[in-house]
């Protein structure tokens, strides 16, 4: 797919990997809808990127909020060609620590945002992309998910985070096989350690 002239929804686009991806897409001639919970940072990033970027305050794990983001992308730029799933959180906590067992609420929150939120965006963006006319190569869209090396080599205190990223890895192939019939490519990257606000906040 040609980036130039295409529209991408980037979750977590206000900072870190999401912001870097959005900047790269705009520099390559694409248009981006930044979907992030951090409204001040998201609006500032959209302002930095100029007229080919817009922002929508988004909770990716909430159906109504996610639908609003997809609609905002289509309203702003006329169509949606790609999803770059970068939004996520991390919680460093031992299964049994000095203060007792791992918080079940924390575990559920990490899974809800990282895994359920990613799937929520995939299904809604795929629906929108499915309405596109295919390009010369038969493509209607592309989806890039962000897992982590932790999905394969999780470290001490990463049970929740590794489980959430492992889930992203596991669902990629069945989703890719299903959406291939609609001309939508699906892939997942698994980065190592990067200096992002999420990591520095641990």
Language model features with spans:
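The beta1-alpha1 cofactor-binding region of Rossmann-like NAD(H)/NADP(H)-dependent oxidoreductases
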Residues: 39-40, 57-69, 104
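Alpha-helical segment proximal to the catalytic Tyr-Lys
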Residues: 127, 177-178
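Active-site loop immediately N-terminal to the catalytic Tyr-X3-Lys motif
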Residues: 96, 153-159, 181-182
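Residue(s) in the substrate-gating loop at a strand-loop-helix junction
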Residues: 148
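Active-site helix of classical SDR
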Residues: 122, 164
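Canonical Rossmann dinucleotide-binding motif of NAD(H)/NADP(H)-dependent dehydrogenases/reductases
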Residues: 2-33, 175
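Substrate-binding pocket helix/loop in short-chain dehydrogenase/reductase
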Residues: 94-111
């Amino acid at each position: 797919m040609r980036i130039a002239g295409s529209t991408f929804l980037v979750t977590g686009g206000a900072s870190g990997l999401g912001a870097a991806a959005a900047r790269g897409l705009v520099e390559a001639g694409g248009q981006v809808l930044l979907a992030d919970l951090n409204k001040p940072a998201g609006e500032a990033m959209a302002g930095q990127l100029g007229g080919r970027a817009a922002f929508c305050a988004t909770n990716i794990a909430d159906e109504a909020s996610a639908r609003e983001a997809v609609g905002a992308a289509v309203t702003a730029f006329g169509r949606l060609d790609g999803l770059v799933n970068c939004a996520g959180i991390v919680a460093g906590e031992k299964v049994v620590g000095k203060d007792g067992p791992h918080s079940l609420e924390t575990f559920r929150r990490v899974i809800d945002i990282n895994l359920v939120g990613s799937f929520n965006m995939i299904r809604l963006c795929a629906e929108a992309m499915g309405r596109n006319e295919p390009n010369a190569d038969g493509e209607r869209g592309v989806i890039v998910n962000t897992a982590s090396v932790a999905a394969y080599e999780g470290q001490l205190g990463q049970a929740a985070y590794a489980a959430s990223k492992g889930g992203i890895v596991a669902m990629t192939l069945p989703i890719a096989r299903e959406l291939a019939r609609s001309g939508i490519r699906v892939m997942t990257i698994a980065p190592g350690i990067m200096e992002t606000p999420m990591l520095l906040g641990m």
